[in-house]
Amino acid sequence: NRSIDLLENLVEITGNRKNISRRGYVLSTRENNIRDLIDQLRFGLGSKSSSLIRYHKKFNKNNYRANSNYDFLDKPDGVDVLQDQKLIQTNFPSFSKDIKTILHIRKGGQINSQQIAEFMMNFCKSNGHKRIKGEVKSINLTDHYTLQLQTESGMQSICVDKIVNAAGPYSDKVAEMLDIKLPIFNILQQKIAFPDHLKAIPRDMPFSIDLDKQSIDWSSDEKEIILTDPDLCFLAKQLPGAVHCRPEGEGDSQWLKLGWAYSTEKMNISRKPELHKYFPEIVLRGAAQLNPALKKYYGKLPKNFVHYGGWYTMTNENWPLIGPMVKEGAFVNSAFSGFGTMAACAAGELCAAWVTESTLPKYANNFSLNRYKNSSLMKTLNKINRGIL
């Protein structure tokens, strides 16, 4: 919530309101018993949970609105829990009719992260900061830090009193230069994007996630072939949930994005990760379980579809690391897996507070390496869903 407040404040400052939507995130399931999900919501919302979670168990079109064109700053906060199938179908007509529960997390949406980043870079430049592009080759600690950088013009030494390790998938390697082992790893995640010329998905649909585990609807012949391939046979078995779909862009845009973080293999990173050639068809079939109209694209995705991927850097519990990095003057701001844009502003604010020795919020230690000393917190985190998207 803090990070989204800061993002919305940036949008107000820049006047860039047309490039933000706050339709929220919709979590769907075919289950009626959602006690575990509600418990996780209460844990995340804390003392305000009773006022921020609203239940809709009977159809009443006046009590709940999925979307509207009203200003993003006037959008509701909290979470709406829908457990009436007529109400669900009225507001989400593209969803499969077997969906029994919807959790509509209101405070979320879509923003042009590149434009926000450009604004931040220009702000830093106008305040006298200089950006140096290069690769960190070594870090030496004496009474200060000396970084050896490989730049386009050659090697360059930079001496500083404090450093922030915000190297994303390279954060562990940067830490190792200081003989520090961070509890992070990298997994490859892939997505596809394509123009929805068949209008399978309503353009005002929120970012929608199918929470349920599923088996892909291969034909019997396809399944038989898949089972004979040791590298692909897992695709004929039950796969984890959290396949997601969202309309991309505003105005006349027709593009959709689909993603599915079913791979949990810890990998050594490369600058150009090797993508799985079957992923586009796999994620399409997975997403079609929630939005059946996507089946119209089976075996015939538009020729200009885009298949891309990158590294999710994360901890086992999928909470970020923000704060001191063991040695005095060294800090880390990393491990954001799939929620980097959402968390960026609050993460930067929190890291800056650590670096400048300012007053810290109550949650500061929970997002730092200090949390591993809190056995009660870690026990709770290890029980809840990691929520990888």
Which residues does each predicted region cover?
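Helical element adjacent to the flavin cofactor pocket in flavoenzyme catalytic cores
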Residues: 96, 102-162, 166-170
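Glycine-rich beta-alpha-beta "Rossmann" dinucleotide-binding loop(s) and their flanking helix/strand
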Residues: 173-191, 358
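Flavin (FAD/FMN) cofactor-binding core of flavoprotein oxidoreductases
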Residues: 74-89, 265-266, 273-342, 349-355, ...
